[in-house]
Every structure is written in C-alpha cells, then in structure tokens.
C-alpha cells in the first residue's frame, strides 16, 4: 500500500494533482478542497489510498490520515465506491460525516450527489458502528480558504460530481454573491455545499 506521497507539485487539474516523487510523476485524485491547498512547484504531502481495479490502478489523495481512513471506511458500505466516497468528502469533513451518521442526519447525506433518501437511510444503518463519534467540532463542509480560482474549482467539482455544464454554470452564478461577501478568501467547501443545495432545489 502507498501510504502517502511527498514532493513538489508538478501539475494541477480540476480533479487531480501530479506529485513528483523520485523523478516520477504520481497522479493523485483529490477533492477540490485538497487541491485548493496545493501550489505548483511547492512541496506537498498527501495521505493516499490505492484503489485496484481489473483495468486500472487509481491513487486517491487526502489532506491527512483521518480523511483517508474515512474514505476507506465509507467504501465498506454496500453501493459505495471510491467515486461516491470522494464525493461525500468533497461535501463534508470527516467529522461532519461522523456527526451525520451518529445523529441520523439523513439530509446531510442526501446533500451529496448520487445519494437519495433511501440510499441515505441505508448508509446511516450500515455506517453507524463503523465511523465512530466526531473527533472535534468541524463544520458541515470543508473550510479550507482559497484566494483565487474558486469559480474554476467549484465548476470542475460539480462537473466531476456528474452535473451538466449548464447546471454547473447556473450553480456557480447562484453562489457568486456568497463568495463575494467572503471577500478575498471564499471557502470552496462551503460554496460547494451551497451550490449543491441550489441544484437540489431546482431538480
């Protein structure tokens, strides 16, 4: 198992980063919030989880070991693959997911694209004894502040979660006032949650 990768960031894409390790570029799939903390040419260390399929090897990257552990635990529930687990962590912090599961907060899970009411109920039952209690007081969405490119990151995140370009455009426009109100440091995680709420209302 590849537990982490460490090295300069060689490339950034809407849903992934390339970290140079020993002269080799390692592609790592990341949430928008993880990507928002990376900068081209700067050193980065990401906890990782390797997902092995018949026709592919995919490395997922996280800000810390706790996020990685939750990513792996989520996949122990039936119907949850790496893409859905990553989508859940794009919308909620690990602690917010623990809190949602421990309190039976169905709405928090339905806020994740790809999870309906019945799916949320099933996940609450299956994950209740697996995620454990919240470790701290983290909010319902990841709050890493970013100073530039929030529109591009948010748009790419929505496309990655399966929304059409038109829907992503409308959602980005809808949350623009919230981003502008935050001044120079809009938080992509909070904007993503607001955008998803907007999309859920219009569907």
From Swiss-Prot:
GO cellular component, one term: Holliday junction helicase complex
Pfam families named in the record: HHH_5, RuvA_C, RuvA_N
Region (Domain II) residue spans: 64-141
Subcellular location field: Cytoplasm
The organism's place on the tree of life at top rank: Bacteria
Cytoplasm recorded as keyword: yes
Region (Flexible linker): 141-145
Region (Domain III) location: 146-203
Chief site of localization: cytoplasm
Keywords: Cytoplasm, DNA damage, DNA recombination, DNA repair, DNA-binding
Region (Domain I): 1-63
Swiss-Prot/TrEMBL GO biological process terms: DNA recombination; DNA repair
InterPro entries: DNA_helicase_Holl-junc_RuvA_I, Hlx-hairpin-Hlx_DNA-bd_motif, NA-bd_OB-fold, RuvA, RuvA_2-like, RuvA_C, RuvA_C_sf
Molecular function terms, GO-annotated: ATP binding; four-way junction DNA binding; four-way junction helicase activity
Summary of subunit composition and partner proteins: Homotetramer. Forms an RuvA(8)-RuvB(12)-Holliday junction (HJ) complex. HJ DNA is sandwiched between 2 RuvA tetramers; dsDNA enters through RuvA and exits via RuvB. An RuvB hexamer assembles on each DNA strand where it exits the tetramer. Each RuvB hexamer is contacted by two RuvA subunits (via domain III) on 2 adjacent RuvB subunits; this complex drives branch migration. In the full resolvosome a probable DNA-RuvA(4)-RuvB(12)-RuvC(2) complex forms which resolves the HJ.
Function: The RuvA-RuvB-RuvC complex processes Holliday junction (HJ) DNA during genetic recombination and DNA repair, while the RuvA-RuvB complex plays an important role in the rescue of blocked DNA replication forks via replication fork reversal (RFR). RuvA specifically binds to HJ cruciform DNA, conferring on it an open structure. The RuvB hexamer acts as an ATP-dependent pump, pulling dsDNA into and through the RuvAB complex. HJ branch migration allows RuvC to scan DNA until it finds its consensus sequence, where it cleaves and resolves the cruciform DNA.
Domain notes: Has three domains with a flexible linker between the domains II and III and assumes an 'L' shape. Domain III is highly mobile and contacts RuvB.
Family membership noted in the UniProt record: Belongs to the RuvA family.
Protein name listed in UniProt: Holliday junction branch migration complex subunit RuvA
Originating species: Streptomyces avermitilis (strain ATCC 31267 / DSM 46492 / JCM 5070 / NBRC 14893 / NCIMB 12804 / NRRL 8165 / MA-4680)
Source organism phylogeny: Bacteria, Bacillati, Actinomycetota, Actinomycetes, Kitasatosporales
């Amino acid at each position: 198992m590849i537990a982490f990768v460490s090295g300069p960031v060689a490339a950034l894409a809407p849903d992934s980063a390339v970290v140079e390790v020993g002269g080799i570029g390692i592609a790592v799939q990341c949430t928008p919030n993880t990507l928002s903390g990376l900068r081209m040419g700067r050193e980065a260390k990401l906890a990782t989880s390797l997902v092995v399929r018949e026709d592919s090897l995919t490395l997922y990257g996280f800000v810390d070991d706790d996020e990685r552990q939750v990513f792996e635990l989520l996949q122990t529930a039936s119907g949850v693959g790496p893409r859905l687990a990553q989508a859940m962590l794009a919308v909620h912090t690990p602690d917010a997911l623990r809190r949602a599961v421990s309190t039976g907060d169905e709405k928090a899970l339905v806020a994740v694209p790809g999870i309906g009411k019945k799916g949320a109920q099933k996940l609450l039952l299956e994950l209740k004894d697996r995620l454990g209690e919240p470790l701290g007081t983290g909010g319902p969405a990841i709050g890493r502040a970013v100073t530039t490119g929030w529109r591009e990151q948010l748009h790419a995140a929505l496309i990655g979660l399966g929304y059409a370009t038109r829907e992503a455009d409308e959602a980005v426009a809808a949350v623009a006032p919230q981003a502008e109100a935050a001044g120079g440091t809009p938080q992509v995680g909070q904007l993503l949650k607001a955008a998803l709420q907007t999309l859920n209302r219009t569907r």
